[in-house]
C-alpha cells in the first residue's frame, strides 16, 4: 500500500540538519479526519438548543445564581466593584462633626507680655473660691525634622475657660517667665492633657527652670482618667478621646502639625490648631468629670440596695475584665 511521507528536520552529531522520512499510514490519517468530523458535529448539535432548553437553563440560573467569589477588596479595587459596597471586614466609621472654636485666642511672643498674661490668669484662678481645683488644659508644640528630630519647645497653650485660650510662643525666650512657672505650679491649678507627662519632661529639658516632677505628681492624663471612669482600656490620643467623649472630629492636618512652630508670627491656621487642642481638652475634662460624678452616685445607690459584698464582687469582676482588655490593647 502506498505511504504518505512527512519531512522533518533532525540534527546530526555534527549539528548538520538532515531530513528524516517518517512513514504515516493512510488509514491513520483517515481515522484522525473522522474524529475531527465527529467533534464538529457534536458542537453544532450543542449550539442548536431548542427554545425550551434555553428557557429551562435561564430558569435554573435565576433560581440558583452563581455564588460570588469572596474577595478582600482594597481601597483601589473597591471603587471598581459593581455593587460599590465596602469591605465587610471594616465597618464604616460614624461621621462626626468637626470641632469649631469661636472663642478668643490670646497670643503672646514677648517675655514681658507672657509674664503679664500668666499673672492675669493666676489672679483669676485665685478668685475661684468655690472650687478647690481649677482645671487648665495644657499642651505644647515644637518643630520636627526627620533629619534632626524634635526641635526646642516652641509653644505652650492653655485653656482656662472654654471661651478663651492662651498661646505663648517661646521662640525668643532664653528663660520662661517666673509668672508662667508660678501659674503652672499653683496649688489650685490642675493641668491636664493627653500624654502630658512627656510634655513636662521635654519642657524641663529645654527650659531647666521648669521642674517636671512636681507638675507630673498633680497632673491628670485624660486617657488614663477615661479608662478609670468609663471602664475602657488601652491608650488614647487626643483625637480618639474627642471622638469617644465629645463626639467630635479633629482636623489633624499634617501640614499644620508638622509646621514651623518656632517661626514668629504663627499664622491663623497654627493659632486655631493650638487653640482647638486645649479647648477640646477642657471639654473632655468637663465631660469625664460629670461621668465620674454620675458613676459615684450610682455606685453609692448600688451599695445601699445590695450591700458592700455584692458591690465588691461586681467591682472585682469589672477589674478582671479590664485587665484582660489591657493585655490585648497595650
UniProtKB/Swiss-Prot annotation:
Pfam families: DNA_pol_A_exo1 (PF01612). Residues 117-289 form the 3'-5' exonuclease domain. Disulfide bonds: none annotated. The keyword Lyase does not apply. Residues 1-92 are annotated as: Disordered. This is 3'-5' exonuclease. It comes from Drosophila virilis. The gene is WRNexo. Its EC number is 3.1.11.-. Belongs to the WRNexo family. GO terms for cellular component: nucleus. Mg(2+) 1 binds at residues 139, 141, 277. Transmembrane segments: none annotated. The modification Phosphoserine is found at residues 79, 87. Residues 27-39, 48-66 have a biased composition (Basic and acidic residues). SMART domains: 35EXOc. It is found in: Nucleus. Mg(2+) 2 binds at residue 139.
